[in-house]
Amino acid sequence: MIFTRCGAVLFLYLITLLLRAQNISVFTSVAPTTQTQGLVLPPTHDFQLLAQFGDTLADGSTLKTSPDFTAFVPKNERSDLGFLSLNHEIPDLQGGVTVFDLAFDKVNQIWEIGHGLPIDFSAAGGISKPCSGGITPWGTVISGEEVIQTTDLDSNGYYDAGWLVETRSSDRKFIQKIWKAGNAIHENCVVAADLKTVYWGADDFSYGYIFKYQAAQKRQLATGKLFVLVRDSPNASTATWVQVPNGTQAQCNNVNTFCQQVGAWNFSGIEDVEIGPYGQIYFATKYSGRIWRFKDKGPTVSDLNIFVENTQYPIQTADGIQWAAWGIGADNLAFDNANNLWVLQDGDNNHIWMVKPTHTAAQPKIELFATTPFGAEPTGISFTPNKRFMFLSFQHPSTNNTATIYDVTGKCVVFDRGTTIVVARKEFLGMSINDCPKPEPIPDLISFDFQLFPNPSATGKATLSSDLFQLGKSVDIAVFDPTGAICYTSKAVSNGKQVCLDFQPKAKGTYLIRVRLDGKMGVSTLIVR
């Protein structure tokens, strides 16, 4: 009997270790480089393309640009069935929210994206710059209009833009603009477990305030009391919630004026606000790059402090510890089921970070999950209920990006426009690498030579040199990994007799470099150490 109990305990322990090893948060950090033309993930993870700007929707319209909040809205708390609600951060009441049906094919381990339709905001006169957002416990999505538009085109007494906007994904319906929550440059919001309390911040350099809203009824946000955070002193870790008048249209339109008069603390550009695993409120500040947190005590706040400072951090990569600058622009936040805080960055290198729950200033615990495509800002971030799949988007990547990479379905992806993907560990998403489509064969005819230097290369970056290269003329470059698969392509422009190769390999090894120019082809090898 003792052996049986010990065996059961050991079995449960081993199962726990296995589940932890399969958590999305288990990875080795990527190298902290600047942006490249592709998405660089840890070798343990992969992605699937879901949507890109210009895709055709079910009604014949095309998917709008500027994807931001990327919300997986589950059906009945399932992790394999739900909706993808995608914000489009476009100004002048021309923004939008597109909702897709999503279902996970468990046999092939890929997401099937179906029926995509835009939500009709004509009843509200449109929606302007819907940025980040939050998923309510009752399954609706609340988006933040990240702009104040003081016109009143529909003559309802409220400004046209600058509100929290609630929608329902299941039937693609606009529900309401939440007037009583006040007019501000909204980013996102998060609803507490009591189904009545909502937190958010203003993404405003001059009026970067933290707000709390207490609805009059559970699941009904149309009416309620509004509060703003007033710090007890400039360096205090305590603060007080001061009620903001919101009884009239004028009061709702002008909450910033009142907040300034009562001394609300300006954090200068608040991005996402999230509730942590132990009830603390976390929020990101864009211009400082910091992540703050506090405990809400009802009428007051305690333990207001900086959780992540904008400084240098040691990152454990496959090649050892490298120091990385955190930088400004901490933006979208989300917690996984291991209590790690995921941080998407809008600014500096636009990285995707993960902060472990045991992180402190004295003993930092920060990982770098991904580097992003040239020009892109990573946006969105939401998880399935089991936290196995992460949904996110890339806003405004450079249209000059030409590098192609394969997603888990074998689809060739170029990050040259607004793009939405799902990410997971490889054991849960897609085919094995041996099942992936193979690239075109390399022709036998070699018609010119070129030189590569440095070779070997420590980073993958190199200069190609040939007398055939002409100033201002484009050269087609393809890189093949040791398995023979294309891992990088580029249409580079010669600066004379030389062309730059900005290749970021995922692993060390010998890579084949193919160059095509005016019907001629050259081949060489690059050693990455």
Feature annotation, model-predicted:
Residues 444-453, 457-529:
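C-terminal outer-membrane/trafficking sorting elements
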